UniProtKB/Swiss-Prot annotation:
Residues annotated to bind Mg(2+): 85, 87, 212
Residue sites binding GTP per the record: 212
Pfam families with a match to the protein in the record: Mab-21, Mab-21_C
Domain of life: Eukaryota
Name this polypeptide is given: Cyclic GMP-AMP synthase-like receptor
UniProt-annotated binding residues for Mn(2+): 316
A GO molecular-function annotation: 2',3'-cyclic GMP-AMP synthase activity
């Protein structure tokens, strides 16, 4: 059942809900421009200096580091709340001979092994300065864990040149601004935690942020793995990446008992950014559902990437006009679609349908989320379907997206013309 089609709402009904959702987006979801400007400036300052330090302290990094690539929800304009989490890929290059006759073999779903046996013979004989014997096994497979550990060591080695602080962090000063910096492990990334000393600044918001630095190898379209969905033909930037995302034992389902340390995660941020761009309400609705997730669930049970994948899969089923429908209509439809995926117990990875993004959850956890989503759907339906003005709850969708304090604010700030169920008006305040 599609909830948005089952509701018998007029254009005015949708206009009321659209106005409410637009208010929610502006006040409780969208990033504030001053915050974005503040954190982007400090992000670029810290990243630039950190790269310089890493180049200076590690000769191999200096030789193989190519560029930084943005990744993640902030750069796709899908971040909600505060811009305090950033993702950057540090693109590294292999010795040129290794790119010839490189072989990608399917492993666990969304993972491959990378074999460079043929090129390795040339590299060994040429005494290549960027060759690291410990990055390869005896069969010429590149070891993902070695790259991950190496990247962590380079970051920590660079930070160790800074003045130490009592809390196992370091002090970095850039153009008169002091930063307190530390690191922690996070999947394939080295997470750099930054605390800004904002004394003397007029900025009064949050002053902590973090950067997930992910080492990545970049490849061209000619190397695109054949066993997955192919690259969109009209994507301008067709380069793609492999990242050393670690596999948990229960996630390693590769045939032939391929060790986790040989497996590399496929990553297609460039292509995904293209797929979701310029689609009217696509991003607005996705961010509203992320807001619902933050209020009702936790990120472990409903990851941001799983939500994004649900939307990319739905884009395959809909034409572009679908995303031009009223904001509330699209929201209700996608809420139902999300519910249906949890009902199936599977959200397939967009590029490799064999990978279930809900696979890390137990059946009971999936059922729990599904039942909660069903209750939310039913509650919204019951709140909106009544044509009796006294019974219709105009704030029913808002009540599922907001916490109690936010809901109180929206009810104070805006009113509904109940005489004709007209769009909202700003509540007048006495001066």
């Amino acid at each position: 059942m599609s909830l948005s089609r089952s509701l018998d709402l007029t254009q005015e009904d949708y206009a009321v809900q659209d106005a409410i959702l637009q208010y929610i987006s502006s006040n409780f979801v969208s990033l504030k421009p001053p915050d974005v400007k503040f954190f982007k400036r400090h992000l670029e300052n810290v990243t630039k200096v950190l790269i310089q330090m890493m180049r200076k302290e590690d000769n191999l990094f200096n030789l193989i580091f190519q560029k930084e690539r943005v990744a993640g929800s902030f750069w796709d304009k899908l971040k909600i709340g505060h811009p305090i989490e950033f993702d950057k890929n540090f693109v590294l290059t292999l010795p040129p001979a290794l790119y010839k006759n490189i072989k990608f073999t399917p492993a666990s779903p969304s993972y491959v092994t990378v074999n460079v046996q043929n090129g390795l013979k040339i590299v060994k004989s040429s005494k290549c300065r960027t060759y690291r014997p410990d990055w390869f096994d005896d069969n010429g497979n590149i070891l993902s864990d070695k790259l991950r550990f190496w990247m962590e060591s380079v970051v920590n080695k660079a930070l160790a040149t800074l003045p130490p602080l009592p809390n196992k962090k370091y002090q970095l000063e850039i153009e008169g601004t002091c930063y307190e910096i530390g690191t922690r492990k996070s999947g394939p990334a080295v997470t750099v935690e930054v605390n800004i000393d904002s004394s003397g600044s007029t900025y009064l918001g949050i002053t902590q942020f973090c950067i997930d630095l992910v080492p990545a190898f970049e490849f061209q379209t000619k190397d695109w793995p054949h066993h997955i969905r192919q690259c969109p033909a009209d994507t301008q930037d067709k380069t793609w990446n492999l990242v050393p995302k670690p596999l948990k034992p229960e996630e390693n389902t590769a045939d032939g008992n391929i060790p986790a340390r040989l497996q590399w995660r496929l990553s297609f941020h460039n292509q995904e950014s293209y797929i979701i761009h310029n689609l009217n309400h696509f991003k607005a609705v996705l961010k509203l559902l992320k807001k619902l997730r933050d209020v009702k669930f936790d990120q472990y049970k409903m990851s941001s990437y799983a939500l994004k994948t649900v939307f990319m899969l739905e884009k395959e089923r809909q034409n572009n006009d679908f995303w031009r429908r009223p904001l509330s209509s699209t929201f209700l439809h996608m809420l139902t679609v999300l519910t249906e995926w949890y009902g199936k117990g599977k959200i397939p990875f967009y590029w490799d349908k064999q990978h279930n993004l809900l696979g890390k959850l137990s059946k009971d956890q999936i059922k729990q989320v599904y039942c909660t989503l069903q209750k939310i759907n039913n509650r919204i339906y019951e709140g909106l379907q009544s044509k009796c003005e006294s019974k219709c709850d105009h704030f029913i969708i808002a009540s599922t997206l907001l916490d109690s304090e936010e809901l109180l604010k929206i009810k104070k700030d805006i009113i509904v013309d109940r005489s004709g169920n007209k769009p909202l008006a700003k509540r007048q305040r006495c001066s």
